[in-house]
A protein has these predicted regions:
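A detector of short terminal or domain-flanking linear segments
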Residues: 1-89, 96-127
Length: 127
């Protein structure tokens, strides 16, 4: 019987553009955040992303990328304009972030991380 073998893969010498380098750096995932988010806000974001994908706009390829972008914008000075709805149901959600964003997230006040993160998502969605 013949033994199956694999041929070695060829390594290509690829050069990255500045935009690709930023994207590679931004997607270097190091940590994970879990929190309880407003279900209605989450559904609005999901629906918007789905409609953008149907239109061919893949600026935010998935929900986690949107969350990372929102936290990154807040880290660089985005003003929080969104007011939380305390009576809306909550859903536990988690997403992965870069080491830089994890350091920033851990520096936020301990008792208000969930509130701040929800306001960050709402403010980023509304802009």
């Amino acid at each position: 019987m013949r033994k199956l073998t694999r041929s070695p893969k060829k390594k290509e010498n690829l050069s990255l553009t500045a935009q690709e380098l930023f994207k590679v750096k931004f997607t270097g995932i190091q940590g994970k955040i879990t929190f309880r988010c407003d279900t209605f806000l989450l559904e609005k974001i999901k629906n918007t992303l789905a409609s953008q994908h149907l239109a061919g706009n893949y600026q935010y390829p998935n929900l986690s990328y949107f969350f990372r972008s929102a936290l990154h914008a807040y880290q660089h000075g985005m003003i929080l304009t969104y007011q939380r709805e305390f009576n809306n149901p909550r859903k536990e959600i988690s997403f992965r972030i870069t080491e830089d964003l994890m350091t920033f997230y851990n520096a936020l006040p301990m008792n208000s991380k969930t509130e701040i993160l929800e306001r960050v998502l709402g403010s980023y969605y509304e802009r």
